[in-house]
């Protein structure tokens, strides 16, 4: 075996030599053609600084230091004006695209379950003028049905072109839009609809039949239900008192000259644009009130961090439009003339679960240049690719490692490796269509390991952002020239960020070498508070002597010398153990989530106990293979319930924890393996795949009692 390895090493020597010669030959022309010197200078420069020398002073971007930006396009101070600007500028250009469903097939799985597989065609596009026509018709139709300006209308629907058309209609006709995640359970949906007093509801046939039908009698205000699909439904199956319309019929009503001739009642910057219900990661969903001016300011900051955003770009929309990251990203893309092709997590790639084997996923067909992703999705891509690498033979694996390490070294220097991109990473890059030039990550922290992998294998910068629903998604985003990891960038030009002491957690603005504390964001992008919840609004929001709004995030951050922010903790994730040690559950999870045997993990601790426990969704393929090697037989549920498999997971947890330098008391010493994945549909994670700790605790209550010695 040793002789074989030596021979292979000798064979691979020319590869090292080729890379060395190539680097020497290509470096000088590449250096000047790509303006690498300027990019390196941009990466190393100060990006934000405090407004004064006083500790705790807010940090601002150096590119807009004297004042905060509140508007991007002159005169476009409301969302409807942004829409009109885009329509007049890009008229006949492709705007919103949807793939045709050619056929559906039922496919039997080895476990006996039947999955529906899709065979999809090409994208069919509406241009800007066609979208505008549909918006006008739909708005006139809603008005004809009796909807008045400033009266709320709710949308409970999957991400699709009709969602965006409905939203733009509401912005233009001054109908405050109440947004609800399509994955919310019955109780949360009923709460949102009743609290917002929405009398009109936009939804899909699938959600109407699967979730709403049984909830309608509990909903007090809704009188009109509009479904977006071109399908027929049996209205007799629904309770009396509801008028059910198709979106097409409402548009046809609005297209009548007597209705279309009535001009819309346009909004002002201080009018309510959206009441966005959160995903409920910390309890019952809260409605966040966003004025037009809040969203305009937030998107002004976000767009500044995406250089070259324009008509040459194609964006793939698949995240929930009820999430502020996806909604502001799509509105920004629409404003700048980018095509938006719609997708879903189940059809995104060739390997996605709803794509029939041999058919093409949405990325392959659309070939997007821009996309947003939550870390959970990037983590899956990373694990899948690295799993394929482990299955390669020695030469292939070694070639990949040589190329990966070489490019990683170049990236850290601020350079690139075009030969590696062409020969090694082209196939990996093709997983997302091959043309992605920038990805935006948000919703949760992205691990440095996954961040580096995406940089290397997908050959593009990752704009890691930090923002909240309450800040209209705007806070920070890393610049494209900044290839550091573990940080979320400098404050956007629309806001300023300060830290305040959190003594209980041991974080202060006077900490050395860098100030640390709770992150507080200020600017016009800060929303107006929580809908019908003055107590919580007063707790989390404040207004300073200059009239500027601030939001206390509950996240703990650290400012680096160049003005970039790092998220280091979360107040609600900190638990004090029986012996007095503090454990950050989020920190533990982030350290262990990239273990090959682990798909997802939730750490848990109680203040009356002395140790941490965990719930783990194991990687089915890897754990099944390991079970075979250990002689463990049975179904997937049997494997997950086997103490020997729990021991193997705990062994990997200890190894990863030691490698990440976790303290002894931070390492989980007991584990419960979950055979079922945590998805938004299970109610155990949000649509951004954030853990719902309360729901997870309730779900695993008996296991918690068992692992802590309860009877």
UniProtKB/Swiss-Prot annotation:
Both triacsin C and rosiglitazone inhibit arachidonoyl-CoA ligase activity. It is a single-pass type III membrane protein. Its cofactor is Mg(2+). GO terms for cellular component: cytoplasm; endoplasmic reticulum; endoplasmic reticulum membrane; extracellular exosome; lipid droplet; membrane; mitochondria-associated endoplasmic reticulum membrane contact site; mitochondrial outer membrane. CDD domains: LC_FACS_euk1 (cd17639). It catalyses: a long-chain fatty acid + ATP + CoA = a long-chain fatty acyl-CoA + AMP + diphosphate; (5Z,8Z,11Z,14Z)-eicosatetraenoate + ATP + CoA = (5Z,8Z,11Z,14Z)-eicosatetraenoyl-CoA + AMP + diphosphate; hexadecanoate + ATP + CoA = hexadecanoyl-CoA + AMP + diphosphate; (E)-hexadec-2-enoate + ATP + CoA = (2E)-hexadecenoyl-CoA + AMP + diphosphate. Its EC number is 6.2.1.3, 6.2.1.15. InterPro entries: AMP-bd_C_sf, AMP-binding_CS, AMP-dep_synth/lig_dom, ANL_N_sf. The modification Phosphoserine is found at residue 447. The chain crosses the membrane at residues 8-28. Keywords: Alport syndrome, ATP-binding, Cell membrane, Deafness, Disease variant, Elliptocytosis, Endoplasmic reticulum, Fatty acid metabolism, Hereditary hemolytic anemia, Intellectual disability, Ligase, Lipid metabolism, Magnesium, Membrane, Microsome, Mitochondrion, Mitochondrion outer membrane, Nucleotide-binding, Peroxisome, Phosphoprotein, Signal-anchor, Transmembrane, Transmembrane helix. The keyword Membrane applies. It is linked to Intellectual developmental disorder, X-linked 63: A disorder characterized by significantly below average general intellectual functioning associated with impairments in adaptive behavior and manifested during the developmental period. Intellectual deficiency is the only primary symptom of non-syndromic X-linked intellectual disability, while syndromic forms presents with associated physical, neurological and/or psychiatric manifestations. AMME complex: An X-linked contiguous gene deletion syndrome characterized by glomerulonephritis, sensorineural hearing loss, intellectual disability, midface hypoplasia and elliptocytosis. Belongs to the ATP-dependent AMP-binding enzyme family. This is Long-chain-fatty-acid--CoA ligase 4. The gene is ACSL4.
């Amino acid at each position: 075996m040793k002789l074989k390895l030596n021979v292979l090493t000798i064979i691979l020597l020319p590869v090292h030599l080729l890379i060395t010669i190539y680097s020497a030959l290509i470096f000088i022309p590449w250096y000047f053609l790509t303006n690498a010197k300027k990019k390196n200078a941009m990466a190393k420069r100060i990006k934000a600084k405090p407004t004064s020398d006083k500790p705790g002073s807010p940090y601002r971007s150096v590119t807009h230091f004297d004042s905060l930006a509140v508007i991007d396009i002159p005169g476009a101070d409301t969302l409807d004006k942004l829409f009109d600007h885009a329509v007049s500028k890009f008229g006949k250009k492709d705007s919103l695209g949807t793939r045709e469903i050619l056929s559906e097939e039922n496919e039997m799985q080895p476990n006996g379950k039947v999955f529906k597989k899709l065979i999809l065609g090409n994208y069919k596009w509406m241009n800007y003028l066609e979208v505008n026509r549909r918006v006008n018709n739909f708005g006139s139709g809603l008005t004809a049905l009796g909807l008045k300006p400033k009266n709320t209308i709710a949308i409970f629907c999957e991400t699709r072109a009709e969602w965006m058309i409905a939203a733009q209609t509401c912005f233009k006709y001054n109908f405050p839009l109440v947004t609800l995640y399509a994955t919310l359970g019955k109780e949360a949906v009923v709460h949102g609809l009743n609290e917002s007093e929405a009398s009109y509801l936009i939804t899909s046939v699938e959600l109407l039949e699967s979730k709403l039908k049984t909830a309608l009698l509990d909903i007090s205000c809704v009188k009109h239900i509009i479904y977006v699909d071109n399908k027929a439904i049996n209205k007799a199956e629904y309770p009396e008192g509801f008028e059910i319309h198709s979106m097409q019929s409402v548009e046809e009503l609005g297209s009548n000259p007597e209705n279309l001739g009535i001009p819309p009642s346009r909004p002002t910057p201080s009018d309510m644009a959206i009441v966005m219900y959160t995903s409920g990661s910390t309890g019952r969903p809260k409605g966040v009130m966003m004025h037009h001016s809040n969203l305009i300011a937030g998107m002004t900051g976000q767009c500044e961090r995406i250089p070259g955003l324009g008509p040459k770009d194609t964006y793939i929309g698949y995240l929930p439009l009820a999430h502020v990251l996806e909604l502001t990203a799509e509105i920004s893309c629409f404003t700048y003339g980018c095509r938006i092709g719609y997708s879903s997590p189940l059809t995104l790639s060739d390997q996605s679960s709803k794509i029939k084997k041999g058919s093409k996923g949405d990325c392959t067909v659309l070939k997007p240049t821009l996309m947003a992703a939550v870390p959970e999705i990037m983590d899956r891509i990373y694990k899948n690719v690295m799993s394929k690498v482990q299955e390669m033979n020695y030469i292939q694996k070694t070639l990949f490692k040589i190329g990966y390490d070489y490019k990683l070294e170049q990236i850290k220097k601020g350079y690139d490796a075009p030969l590696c991109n062409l020969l090694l990473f082209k196939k990996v890059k093709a997983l997302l269509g091959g043309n992605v030039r920038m990805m935006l990550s948000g919703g949760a922290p992205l691990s440095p390991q996954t961040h580096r992998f995406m940089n290397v294998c997908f050959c593009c910068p990752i704009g890691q952002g930090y923002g909240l629903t309450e800040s209209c998604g705007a806070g920070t985003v890393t610049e494209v020239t900044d290839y550091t990891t573990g940080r979320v960038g400098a404050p956007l030009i629309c806001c300023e960020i300060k830290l305040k002491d959190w003594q209980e957690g041991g974080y202060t603005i006077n900490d050395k070498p860098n100030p640390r504390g709770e992150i507080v964001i200020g600017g016009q992008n800060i929303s107006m508070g929580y809908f019908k919840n003055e107590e919580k609004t007063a707790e989390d929001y404040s207004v300073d002597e200059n009239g500027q709004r601030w939001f206390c995030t509950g996240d703990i951050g650290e400012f680096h010398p160049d003005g970039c922010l790092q998220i280091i903790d979360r107040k609600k994730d900190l638990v004090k153990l029986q012996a007095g040690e503090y454990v950050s559950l989020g920190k533990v999870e982030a350290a262990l989530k990239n273990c090959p045997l682990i798909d997802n993990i939730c750490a848990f601790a109680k203040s009356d106990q002395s140790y941490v426990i965990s719930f783990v969704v194991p990687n089915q393929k890897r754990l099944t293979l390991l079970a075979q090697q250990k002689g463990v037989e049975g179904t997937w549920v049997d494997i997950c319930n086997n103490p020997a498999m729990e021991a193997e997971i705990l062994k990997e947890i200890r190894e990863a924890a030691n490698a990440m330098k976790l303290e002894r008391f931070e390492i989980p010493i007991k584990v419960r393996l979950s055979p079922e994945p945590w998805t938004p549909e299970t109610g155990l994670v949000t649509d951004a795949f954030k853990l719902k700790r309360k729901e997870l605790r309730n779900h695993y209550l008996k296991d918690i009692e068992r692992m802590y010695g309860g009877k």
